[in-house]
Amino acid sequence: MEAERQNQLVARLEDYAEREQALRRYLDYDAKSERLQVVNAELEDPAIWNDPKHAQDLGREKKSLEDVVETLTELGSGLADSCELVELALADSDDATLEAIEHDADRFQEKLETLEFRRMFANPADPLNCFVDIQAGAGGTEAQDWASMLLRQYLKYAERKGFKAEILEESEGDVAGLKSATIKIEGEYAFGYLRTETGVHRLVRKSPFDSSGGRHTSFASVFVYPEVDESFEVEVNPADLRIDTYRASGAGGQHINKTDSAVRITHAPSGIVVQCQNDRSQHRNRAEAMQMLKSKLYELEMRNRMTEQQKLEDSKTDVGWGHQIRSYVLDQSRIKDLRTNVEISNTQKVLDGDLDPFIQASLKQGV
């Protein structure tokens, strides 16, 4: 191995070791390690299952802690071994070992970047699960088809990230596609990853619904909000609620449309409307809809608190809640984020859920 490459390898390992130590401090490795021991001890107690919800909460906490503690432990150990081994390999001019260490360094870099990316999640709600509302804009069948394409895109994104996705509500379009849909996405930092997707998404293409092959522009809005838990206090006055039941619509099996199991809740003071139809049980649909309502009310409160700050920010930039954020020009093979200027030419890959380039750029720029 040439001398320059050797020097680069040594410099990389030294840099990675410094970054690993910085991450230990920033992510509070010692405290998380101690907490993990406590959580493991609690989960080993058979009595924990007398309270299934508490046990599930501890299980989720354990996974979150392990993701940090085990990754940093393995990273620190691997870097220490490689730093020691590289000195021996250099002394013996052992090129095979040096190349193996280079390969390990690539893995170290990937793990470091994953952990460093977590520093982008400053919102207290970032670690939570989330709901994604998709609403077709003006444009009839073309816009409704676009809404269904976005639904598929986010389901594919969740699959890529290892998140669990569930369609809670979908209202079919008049001819094709969807008028609206709501999906729940469960996974670590689901809201943190997806929150920058909120906004208006614009599609430009030759419409399959136009026999002349004309070029059409259509819009759909996306709204992402966190699923709040008991640690977030949200008060709902039952007197402010109007609860309606109706028969579920959309794709379904033999039980679909047999009973009024779907639930719609309207919160009079805010005008917020939520609906859920994914379960055959009206009781479970009602509970899920209430959770959605509380989550939307929490997000509304957070946005109200930030109104003045947003006014200042909006005076500096053209990025706001209701502004267009991304343009999908399919016949020119171009998808561009209008906030970060990230542009992708492989449109099908994006529509198949590869949103990471857009999301990472948005988080890094603090969108």
Swiss-Prot record:
The keyword Kinase does not apply. Keywords: Cytoplasm, Methylation, Protein biosynthesis. The gene is prfB. Methylated by PrmC. Methylation increases the termination efficiency of RF2. One of its GO terms (cellular component) is cytoplasm. Belongs to the prokaryotic/mitochondrial release factor family. The modification N5-methylglutamine is found at residue 254. GO terms for biological process: viral translational frameshifting. It comes from the Bacteria. The gene for this protein contains a UGA in-frame termination codon after Leu-27; a naturally occurring frameshift enables complete translation of RF-2. This provides a mechanism for the protein to regulate its own production. The keyword Protein biosynthesis applies. One of its GO terms (molecular function) is translation release factor activity, codon specific. It holds the Pfam family RF-1. This is Peptide chain release factor 2. HAMAP family: Rel_fac_2. It comes from Bordetella pertussis (strain Tohama I / ATCC BAA-589 / NCTC 13251). It is found in: Cytoplasm. Peptide chain release factor 2 directs the termination of translation in response to the peptide chain termination codons UGA and UAA. InterPro entries: PCRF (IPR005139), Pep_chain_release_fac_I (IPR000352), Pep_chain_release_fac_I_sf (IPR045853), PrfB (IPR004374).
